[in-house]
């Protein structure tokens, strides 16, 4: 099932009109769209109905190749809410990027100890995302050397999982407020990754996430913290420069640390937000977790967009 939603201007998540198009979503070139467009789709994948939004920006040209960002909502969130507060609509419009917002199973992703029914039922979310990428690539003009993953909280853990288990697909990853919750995959080859984390995050603590795993998983598996996660990725990417991350930029409200001399020309970065909590998206009307309004989404995009396969 496909619903075509026309995005009103300014591009802030408002939806002005819905069409009644209903076509087979497995056939390429399925619709002649008016841009910008927000397309709401569902199809059966592995016996389950899976849904997503696709933002096709004003600058989309089927004769050119466009980057793709897979943008994953957090636990108990959904694709529509995340479209409205993640600000990747701005990135899409300013850079002619296609952004897809998948919907997690029961509003969750299977990404390690966090979180919800997707984890409990062993949902193959990596498989779902890879099939979704194949579908989008068949229907739109995608630069397959510039596919990126992003997300928030449980969606950030899923972003890490995709970077770890599908490093042959993704050129880079960048997300907010969670870590890699699995061991390095045998198939992993280094790609670049940036994580953004608020020092005042009470849901996924900056220092270590034991309280989070105890709450969400009734376990003490949450040994990960923001700096340790950065160090772990540095080791996975065989980064040079010693065990302690280098501080590259430092301001009153945030800093950027990590490694910039790693295998395959990759980098691993951590953005520490001194006054932010769990949802540090800019100009956020849903949450007030980024009080100094650091443009975290732009930081993530500028980092990811440097890299291609």
For each predicted feature, which ranges?
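Catalytic active-site module of serine/aspartate enzymes centered on a nucleophile-bearing elbow/loop
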Residues: 288-309
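Short beta-strand/loop motif that positions the catalytic acidic residue
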Residues: 195-197, 201
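A domain-start/cap signature at the N-terminus of enzymes
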Residues: 14, 20-68, 80, 94, ...
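Hydrophobic core
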Residues: 5-13
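Serine-hydrolase catalytic machinery in alpha/beta-hydrolase-like enzymes
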Residues: 39, 43-53, 59, 63-148, ...
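Alpha/beta-hydrolase
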Residues: 70-72, 176, 273
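Acidic catalytic loop of the alpha/beta-hydrolase fold
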Residues: 201-204, 278-280
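Short alpha-helix in the alpha/beta-hydrolase fold that links the catalytic acid
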Residues: 84-85, 206-214, 222-235, 245, ...
């Amino acid at each position: 099932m496909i619903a075509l939603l026309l995005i009103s201007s300014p591009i802030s998540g408002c939806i002005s009109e819905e069409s009644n198009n209903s076509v087979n979503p497995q056939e390429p070139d399925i619709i002649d769209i008016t841009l910008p467009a927000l397309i709401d789709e569902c199809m059966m994948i592995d016996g389950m109905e899976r849904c997503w939004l696709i933002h096709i920006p004003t600058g989309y040209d089927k004769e050119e190749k466009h980057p793709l960002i897979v943008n994953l909502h957090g636990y108990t969130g959904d694709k529509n809410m995340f479209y409205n507060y993640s600000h990747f609509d701005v990135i899409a419009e300013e850079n002619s990027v296609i952004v897809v917002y998948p919907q997690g199973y029961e509003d969750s992703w299977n990404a390690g100890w966090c979180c919800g029914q997707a984890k409990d039922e062993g949902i193959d979310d990596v498989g779902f995302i890879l099939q979704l990428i194949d579908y989008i690539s068949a229907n739109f003009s995608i630069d397959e050397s510039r596919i990126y993953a992003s997300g928030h909280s449980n969606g950030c853990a899923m972003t890490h999982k995709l970077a770890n288990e599908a490093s042959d697909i993704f050129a880079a990853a960048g997300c907010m407020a969670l870590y890699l919750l699995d061991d390095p995959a045998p198939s992993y080859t280094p790609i670049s990754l940036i994580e953004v984390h608020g020092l005042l995050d009470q849901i996924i603590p900056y220092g270590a996430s034991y309280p989070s795993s105890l709450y969400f998983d009734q376990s003490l598996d949450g040994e990960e913290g923001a700096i340790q996660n950065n160090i772990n990725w540095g080791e996975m990417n065989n980064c040079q420069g010693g065990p302690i991350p280098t501080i590259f930029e430092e301001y009153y409200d945030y800093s950027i640390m990590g490694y910039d001399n790693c295998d395959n020309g990759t980098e691993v970065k951590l953005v520490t937000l001194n006054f932010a909590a769990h949802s540090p998206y800019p100009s956020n009307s849903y949450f007030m977790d980024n009080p100094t309004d650091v443009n975290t989404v732009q930081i993530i995009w500028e980092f990811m967009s440097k890299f291609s396969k």
